[in-house]
């Protein structure tokens, strides 16, 4: 699925332009001189992105530890299509330049000219980027900008399991709250149960962080028993222990797949399309709140409390979007949803046509309480608040 299709339908006119603008997020400002230590990279004009075809693909794979391939349709003849493809190439060229010393390569696979190669490599979604590392293939579902792609690939280069060996690392682990995380306690790296945990981690790397400890003191603070694995849902303080330890790779993978949709989850640039595509029967409950803003912070804390109280409800999933993370999309969202993102908002969005209904807040200075939010969410889940009713009102 193409980048312009993922956050909504092709029929939404402003979306294509908004996401095209996002392509330039990673490009440097020309004419701005960086001081030593803050010298942003500028494209040096060297071609590093390879056109991968039947003749060279085997050699290309041998050359790089990690290879990112953009599977694309041939650009159309019109100027806009040609320009967009050139921009995408430049973004990949800059990322390739930055990561050249890390053993990361970039390539293009044409869906028409190189269809046979695409089939051999398992490339199925046109306008998607696939990342190859060893035996693993990762589909990149994030913002197409150089900085986000580079950050993602640096994470790919890291080991799939991070070890917790002391108090500071434990504190850093505990400070992670806005994403799913797992941690297990094992005897050593040679343990067969740790190997199973590591193999499972590779299945979700780098989207879901896996941690492990071999330190009994760390395990005691986490109340972990030997070969036990705890699963933390995003924004939840208490973990769920994967049952029936010791667990096989298959058991761990199945558990994560079953529980990976958190009650409250944050839309992030590196995984924005994956999150948006994971809708609930064609709708999303979406909350906008700036964490750095006092009202946004207060509203977010209320959302967390509601999510924690309703974590057992499989039908409830709220996507939190911090507008500060997506400045170029703010005007589009405000126009499409007819809302003011200078204040917190929560609503229901239809992913097919971007129709939406937003919670009415009686007093702009008085944010909704947890009880009021729960009542509103209950009405949404029961179908009393939905985007179809909003369409009927518009017709009237």
UniProtKB/Swiss-Prot annotation:
**Could you say which tissues express the protein in this record?**
Expressed in myoblasts (at protein level).
**What membrane topology term does the record carry?**
Peripheral membrane protein
Signal peptide (residue range): 1-34
Listed A to Z, the keywords are: Calcium, Disease variant, Endoplasmic reticulum, Glycoprotein, Membrane, Metal-binding, Mitochondrion, Muscle protein, Phosphoprotein, Sarcoplasmic reticulum, Signal
* Effect on the protein of changing residue 385 to T: In TAM1; no effect on calcium-dependent susceptibility to proteolytic degradation; increased moderately calcium-dependent aggregation; increased moderately calcium-dependent polymerization; no effect on subcellular localization; no effect on the subcellular localization of STIM1; decreased calcium content of intracellular stores; loss of the ability to inhibit store-operated calcium entry (SOCE) activity
Annotated positions of the Phosphoserine modification? 81, 216
Question: Any idea which residues bear Phosphotyrosine here?
Answer: 43
List the glycosylation sites. Answer: 350
Give any Gene Ontology cellular component. sarcoplasmic reticulum lumen
- Annotated positions of the Phosphothreonine modification: 124
Q: Which GO terms describe its biological process?
A: endoplasmic reticulum organization; positive regulation of release of sequestered calcium ion into cytosol; positive regulation of store-operated calcium channel activity; protein polymerization; regulation of skeletal muscle contraction by regulation of release of sequestered calcium ion; regulation of store-operated calcium entry; response to denervation involved in regulation of muscle adaptation; response to heat
Q: Which Pfam families match?
A: Calsequestrin
Which residues lie in coiled coils?
Answer: none
Task: Enumerate the subcellular locations listed in this protein's record, separating them with semicolons.
Answer: Endoplasmic reticulum; Sarcoplasmic reticulum; Sarcoplasmic reticulum lumen; Sarcoplasmic reticulum membrane
PTM comment text: N-glycosylated.
Enumerate the SUPFAM superfamilies for this protein: Thioredoxin-like
One annotated GO molecular function is: calcium ion binding
Disorder cited: Myopathy, vacuolar, with CASQ1 aggregates: An autosomal dominant mild muscle disorder characterized by adult onset of muscle cramping and weakness as well as increased levels of serum creatine kinase. The disorder is not progressive, and some patients may be asymptomatic.
Q: What does this protein do?
A: Calsequestrin is a high-capacity, moderate affinity, calcium-binding protein and thus acts as an internal calcium store in muscle. Calcium ions are bound by clusters of acidic residues at the protein surface, often at the interface between subunits. Can bind around 80 Ca(2+) ions. Regulates the release of lumenal Ca(2+) via the calcium release channel RYR1; this plays an important role in triggering muscle contraction. Negatively regulates store-operated Ca(2+) entry (SOCE) activity.
Subunit field text: Monomer; increases in response to a depletion of intracellular calcium. Homodimer. Homotetramer and homopolymer. Can form linear homooligomers. Ca(2+) ions promote oligomerization. Interacts (via C-terminal end and preferentially with the monomeric form) with STIM1; this interaction increases in response to a depletion of intracellular calcium, decreases both STIM1 aggregation and clustering, interaction of STIM1 with ORAI1 and store-operated Ca(2+) entry (SOCE) activity. Interacts with ASPH and TRDN.
Q: Which PANTHER family match?
A: CALSEQUESTRIN, CALSEQUESTRIN-1
As for family, the record states:
Belongs to the calsequestrin family.
Question: What name does UniProt use for this protein?
Answer: Calsequestrin-1
């Amino acid at each position: 699925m193409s980048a312009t299709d993922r956050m909504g339908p092709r029929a939404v006119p402003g979306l294509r332009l908004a996401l095209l603008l996002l392509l330039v997020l990673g490009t440097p400002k020309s004419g701005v001189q960086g001081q030593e230590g803050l010298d942003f990279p500028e494209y040096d004009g060297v071609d590093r992105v390879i056109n991968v075809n039947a003749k060279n693909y085997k050699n290309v794979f041998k050359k790089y530890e990690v290879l990112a391939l953009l599977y694309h349709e041939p650009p159309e003849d019109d100027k806009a299509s040609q320009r967009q493809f050139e921009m995408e190439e430049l973004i990949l060229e800059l990322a390739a330049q930055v990561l050249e010393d890390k053993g990361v390569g970039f390539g293009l696979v044409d869906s028409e000219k190189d269809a046979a190669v695409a089939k051999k490599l398992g490339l199925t979604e046109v306008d998607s980027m696939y990342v190859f590392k060893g035996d693993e293939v990762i589909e990149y579902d994030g913002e197409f900008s150089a900085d986000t792609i580079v950050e993602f690939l640096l994470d790919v280069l890291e080991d799939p399991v991070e070890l917790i060996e002391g108090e500071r690392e434990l504190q850093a682990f505990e400070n992670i709250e806005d994403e799913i995380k797992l941690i297990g306690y094992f005897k050593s790296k040679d343990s067969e149960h740790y190997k199973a945990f590591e193999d499972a981690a590779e299945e979700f790397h780098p989207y879901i962080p896996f941690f492990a400890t071999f330190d009994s003191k760390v395990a005691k603070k986490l109340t972990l028993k030997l070969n036990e694995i705890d699963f933390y849902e995003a924004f939840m303080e208490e973990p769920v222990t994967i049952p029936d330890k010791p667990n096989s790779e298959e058991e761990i993978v199945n558990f994560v797949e079953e529980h990976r949709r958190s009650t409250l989850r944050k839309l992030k640039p590196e995984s924005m399309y994956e999150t948006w595509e994971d809708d609930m029967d064609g709708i999303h409950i979406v909350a906008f709140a700036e964490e750095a803003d006092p009202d946004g912070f207060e509203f977010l804390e209320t959302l967390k409390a509601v999510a924690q109280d309703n974590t057992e409800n499989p039908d409830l999933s709220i996507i939190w979007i911090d507008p500060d993370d997506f400045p170029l999309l703010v005007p589009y969202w405000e126009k499409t949803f007819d809302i003011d993102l200078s204040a917190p908002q929560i609503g229901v969005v239809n992913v097919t046509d971007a129709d939406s209904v937003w919670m009415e807040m009686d007093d702009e200075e008085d944010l909704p309480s947890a009880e009021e939010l729960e009542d509103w969410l209950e009405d949404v889940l029961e179908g009393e608040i939905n985007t179809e009713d909003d369409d009927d009102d518009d017709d009237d």
